């Protein structure tokens, strides 16, 4: 009986955490740290970004904006569901771009990249914010980061973690709804 009580307390703590503003704030801070790392590699270490890297940055900025807005909005089930849905789309987009970059880097992919971002004229972020979104290199390899992982591998791991965090929040939302109904 004691194990069930302990498990229930742990589940409640995890659920409360995943439904809190702190969760969204943490996701926003992690996203900002990832962007700061990319800019450090670009401007301090001289590692210029390619088309796929910039597309990954766009997904990351989308995720960061969703997380920031969700941290500021009232915590209602509807808004939480919409926010989690948007965050999931951004995180999955980031995983896809990371996987594509990983494949290119390791000679597994069947693709390449260009010196243009490839966005329509009405969404010319590379012209509006060239310091953040201008393509300056062709895809080939990404620099090494911590633990001998390449930037593509690190990004793939981080993006997968983001997807799991959002899925956890969605599960927590469903869990609280099911608990309230019973």
Where are these regions (language model features)?
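Short, charged juxtamembrane terminal tails flanking transmembrane helices
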Residues: 3, 12, 176-182
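Interfacial segments of alpha-helical transmembrane regions
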Residues: 16-29, 75-95, 164
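Membrane-interface loop-to-helix entry segments
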Residues: 52-62, 129-133, 146-161
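Structural signal for the C-terminal ends of transmembrane alpha-helices
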Residues: 68-76, 164-174
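C-terminal TM-helix exit segments that contain a strictly Trp-centered aromatic cap at the helix terminus
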Residues: 33-42, 92-108, 125
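Non-cytosolic membrane-interface motifs at loop->transmembrane helix junctions
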Residues: 47-57, 83, 112-114
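Extracytosolic (periplasmic/ER-lumenal) interhelical loops and adjacent juxtamembrane/interface segments
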Residues: 105-152
